[in-house]
């Protein structure tokens, strides 16, 4: 097995059950890995959580779940760590979650070195290695072929959801901290967090990072009916995004 040498952060809590094997696999795959404690309001006291829920509804018309706020706070902890790395402003740091699954390690290693980490001087500030269950769409005008099977370019921002496999620079971390300083949308609603910013965003398709899907979500309750409904909705939106991306 190829072992990556990528500075990586994994959001994880000892309160999560059934994901220890996932973490062991990530440790075997990645050379530099740091664990950051996840935030779970249902298990721990989060100051002003009720007020934060109320404020999110006031700002957007829809209240965030406490678990969604916890997820956002967890990623903000990682962004703070990266934002403080002032000596490596252009270096990329990989961010994963406890159920992240690297499905193409060699591709991740090579693409990371050749695309986002060229002498620590990447043209991208934020790069998605997997998002929205592999349904990220890349704008055709920016798309370049990479290693036969893959395409790299600027993603259609409305096709990017999920925080289980992305990398950012300290510059991007600082901007995300600023954009999410007021609790309003879930952490993976990038179409809101990244609007009117000058960040250079990239993505790869097919995805090289996915999720294991062997344990239940820690954010929202999902039964079989909801999963089927979500899958159908995703197919409809993916078809729409495919057409939009073709003309972008």
Give the location of each predicted region.
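An acidic/histidine-cluster motif and surrounding catalytic segment
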Residues: 2-96, 100-248
């Amino acid at each position: 097995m190829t072992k990556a040498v990528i500075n990586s952060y994994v959001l994880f809590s000892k309160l999560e059950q059934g994901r220890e094997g996932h973490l062991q696999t990530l440790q075997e795959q990645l050379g530099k890995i740091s664990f950051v404690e996840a935030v779970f309001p249902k298990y721990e006291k989060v100051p002003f959580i009720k007020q934060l829920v109320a404020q999110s509804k006031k700002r957007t018309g829809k209240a965030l779940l406490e678990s969604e706020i916890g997820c956002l706070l967890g990623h903000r902890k990682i962004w703070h760590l990266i934002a403080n790395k002032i000596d490596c402003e252009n270096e990329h740091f990989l961010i994963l979650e406890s159920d992240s699954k690297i499905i193409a390690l060699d591709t991740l290693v090579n693409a990371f070195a050749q695309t986002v980490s060229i002498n620590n001087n990447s043209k991208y500030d934020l790069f998605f290695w997997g998002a929205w269950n592999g349904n990220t769409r890349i704008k055709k005008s920016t798309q370049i072929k990479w290693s036969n099977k893959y395409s790299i370019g600027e993603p259609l921002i409305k096709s990017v959801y999920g925080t289980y496999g992305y990398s950012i620079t300290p510059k991007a971390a600082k901007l995300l901290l600023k954009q999410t300083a007021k609790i309003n949308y879930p952490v993976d609603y990038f179409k809101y967090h990244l609007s009117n910013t000058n960040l250079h965003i990239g993505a790869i398709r097919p995805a090289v990072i996915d999720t294991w899907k062997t344990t239940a979500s820690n954010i929202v309750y999902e039964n079989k009916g909801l999963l089927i409904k979500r899958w159908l909705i995703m197919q409809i939106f993916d078809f729409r995004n495919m057409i939009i991306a073709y003309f972008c």
